[in-house]
Structures are given as C-alpha cells and as structure tokens.
Amino acid sequence: MSAGRPEQKAEDLREAMFVIGRAARAASRELALASNSTKNAALCAMAAHLRQQSGAILQANAADLEAAKAGGLAASFIDRLTLTDDRIEAMARGLEEIAELPDPVGVTLAEWTRPNGLRFERVRVPIGVIGIIYESRPNVTADAGGLCIKAGNAAILRTGSDAFRS
C-alpha cells in the first residue's frame, strides 16, 4: 500500500493508538502509586511550564485561529479556541488550584461488617487510563489532564483538529 491510501493511514493511526495506550498504561501504574506531594509537584510544574511557554503557545494558537477563520468557523467557536495571556494564566492557576485540593485517592467512602464478622470498605482508587475526546478548547487540555493526574490516572487527551497546534 502507498502511504497516501486511507487503509495505510488507518493502520498508522491504529499503531499510534496502541503505542499511546501502552505508554499510558505504564504511566498509570506509576501515577496510581504516586504520593499526593508528587502529584502536586507535577501539577505545579505543569503550571510553571504553561507560563514559561506562553509565547510559543500563543504563536501556535495564532496559527490555529488563522486556519479556523479561513475555514469560516463560527465566531463563538473561534472565541473558545482563542488563547490570550490571561487565559493561559487562568489555565496555570487552575492547575495550581487542583494541586491544593485534597488527595481523592485512598479515601474510605463506606465501611460495613457482615454478621459473620467479614469487614468491607469502599475506597477511592485510580481508574487507570482515562480517554477524553473534546471540542477544540485548549483550556480543557490543562483542566482534564490536571484532574486526571490528581486522581492518580493517566490520560489520553484528544482535542479537536482545529486546536492541534495550540
């Protein structure tokens, strides 16, 4: 098959998804065991990285916006796609706020003892890998990724194609 045929592209996508899935599964094992301080440090590092890379992010977003406008997308869609210094700062603050939340992992939600003495507990545990597909809203990437990390889960995030560069 030639590289341009749809069958080849589908096979390439399938292989890419397997690679991403395997990497996410491996990461999920580490995240599930990560301490709250480790997860919080990662969230704060993500916030710092957003701030440090804001110029490059805004430049990439400008390319996404140009393509969206050329494609005749609605003004409301373009507004949701648009990043500014203030919006990037809000994304970074959101990650820091997630870091300040209590660790949800290991919290006992319920416990009971059966008449035969057998004791049960319902405890919050990480799910493992969470896949999220969402509209072209760059801020969702930070919010969803941050919440997944806080809960000890790996995430596979897929934004709309209009925000790939952002």
In which residue ranges do the predicted regions lie?
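Conserved small-residue-rich beta-alpha loop and adjacent elements
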Residues: E100, P104-S166
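N-terminal Rossmann-like NAD(P)+-binding subdomain of aldehyde/semialdehyde dehydrogenases
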Residues: M1-L118
